[in-house]
Amino acid sequence: MKELVNILDFLPEELGEKIKPMFRVKQIYQWIYQKYANNFSDMSSLPKDLRLELAQNFHFSPVKCVKNEQSKDGSIKYLFELIDGLRVESVLLPMKKEKINTEGKRISHARYTICVSSQVGCKSGCSFCLTAKGGLKRNLSTGEIVGQILWIKKQNNIPYERRVNIVYMGMGEPLDNLKNVSKAVKILAQNDGLAISPRRQTISTSGLAKQIKELGQMNLGVLLAISLHAVNDELRTELMPINKAYNIAAIMDAVREFPIDQRKRVMFEYLLIDGINDKLEHAKELVKLLNGIKAKVNLILFNPHEGSLYKRPSLENAIKFQDLLSNKGVTCTIRESKGLDISAACGQLKERAKEQ
C-alpha cells in the first residue's frame, strides 16, 4: 500500500511541482486552511479526478487530539498524538475577550495566542522545565507543527482571517529544528492559507547562538525570544546546561546581529526562582547586560511541577525586580501564568503517557 504524504508539509510552489495548473494549488490551500475542509472529497470546486488523485497521494491529518483540558482562566491544553504514537502538547491562550456594546453589537473580537510544540521532548536539559525530564525523542515535521495550529483554530471556530499570535514556546527547542520550524513560519504566512504574518510569530530559544544567526540570515521577519533566566555564566550553566556550548556573551553577540523591525524588540524571558535568581543584584546585572539592545524583559514566576525542588517567588519580590528594571529604562512586564491549574503554563508541558 502506498504511503501517503502529509500535504501540510508543502509550500504552494512545492505543491505546484506536483499539481497543475497552479491555480488549483491556490484552491487546495484555501480549502485546507480557510474553509477547514475535513477531507479531499469536501473540495467541491476541484475536478473529481483531482480530488481522487489527492486522496491517493496525500493526507492532512498528522495530529490527533486525544485529550484536552480547560483552565479556569479559559486556556485550553491539547494533547496530540502523532502518526507514530508519540505525543506533544499545545495550548490555546485567550488574551483578550470579545467586547459587546450596550446595543448588543460586537465592537472587538477575542484575541488568542497559540503555544505550539516543535519537538517531542527536548535535549536542552533545563533544570526548571518538565519537558526536559524525558529527553528528546524526535523533531516534529513541518506538517505536524502546522497541524497543531490548524486543528486548534478549526476546533475553536476561529475564522482563518482572525488574527492569532503564534509562539514556538511549547515542547522542544525550536532552533534545534530550524529547518522545519522556518518552513512552518512560511506556510502559516501564506495569503491563501491562514495568513499569519511572521510579525505575529515568535520563536523562542534557550540560546543557540549559531542558529540565532542562521535564523537572522533567513530574514523571515519573525520575532525572537531568548530564554535567559540568569545574568552570569555560572548560574546559567547550573540552570541551563546548554550554556556550556553557548555562553551569555555568545548569545548577546548573536542577538546584536539579529534583524529586528524598528518598532519591535527582542524579548528576553527571565524565569524568577525564589532565592536563586530573583535578587535585586541580579536585576542590576540584567540592566548592564541589556545595555544597547532593543530589549523587552518578560518576567515569569516559576511554575511548580512534579519532581521540582524550586519554589515560586512572591509577587511582591517580582514587582520589586520589575520596578528596578523599569526605573533603569528597561521595558519589563510580569507574564500572567495562564493554565497553571491544568499544567499548561511555562515549563509544565511534557509528553504524556498513553494510559492518560
Swiss-Prot record:
Residues reported in the UniProt entry to bind [4Fe-4S] cluster: C122, C126, C129
Keyword Cytoplasm: yes
Alphabetical list of Gene3D superfamilies matching this protein: 1.10.150.530, Aldolase class I
GO biological process, one term: tRNA methylation
The Radical SAM core domain, residue ranges: 108-341
Domain of life: Bacteria
Annotated S-adenosyl-L-methionine binding sites: G172, E173, S204, S227, L228, H229, N303
List of catalytic residues: E89 (proton acceptor), C346 (s-methylcysteine intermediate)
Primary subcellular site in the record, as a coarse category: cytoplasm
GO CC terms in record: cytoplasm
EC number: 2.1.1.192
Gene Ontology MF annotations: 4 iron, 4 sulfur cluster binding; metal ion binding; rRNA (adenine(2503)-C2-)-methyltransferase activity; rRNA binding; tRNA (adenine(37)-C2)-methyltransferase activity; tRNA binding
Cofactor: [4Fe-4S] cluster
UniProt keyword terms in alphabetical order: 4Fe-4S, Cytoplasm, Disulfide bond, Iron, Iron-sulfur, Metal-binding, Methyltransferase, rRNA processing, S-adenosyl-L-methionine, Transferase, tRNA processing
Record text on cofactor binding: Binds 1 [4Fe-4S] cluster. The cluster is coordinated with 3 cysteines and an exchangeable S-adenosyl-L-methionine.
Disulphides: C115-C346
Localization of this protein: Cytoplasm
Catalysed reactions listed for this entry: adenosine(2503) in 23S rRNA + 2 reduced [2Fe-2S]-[ferredoxin] + 2 S-adenosyl-L-methionine = 2-methyladenosine(2503) in 23S rRNA + 5'-deoxyadenosine + L-methionine + 2 oxidized [2Fe-2S]-[ferredoxin] + S-adenosyl-L-homocysteine; adenosine(37) in tRNA + 2 reduced [2Fe-2S]-[ferredoxin] + 2 S-adenosyl-L-methionine = 2-methyladenosine(37) in tRNA + 5'-deoxyadenosine + L-methionine + 2 oxidized [2Fe-2S]-[ferredoxin] + S-adenosyl-L-homocysteine
Note: Reaction proceeds by a ping-pong mechanism involving intermediate methylation of a conserved cysteine residue.
Family of the protein in this entry: Belongs to the radical SAM superfamily. RlmN family.
Entry function: Specifically methylates position 2 of adenine 2503 in 23S rRNA and position 2 of adenine 37 in tRNAs. m2A2503 modification seems to play a crucial role in the proofreading step occurring at the peptidyl transferase center and thus would serve to optimize ribosomal fidelity.
HAMAP family for this protein: RNA_methyltr_RlmN
Protein name: Dual-specificity RNA methyltransferase RlmN
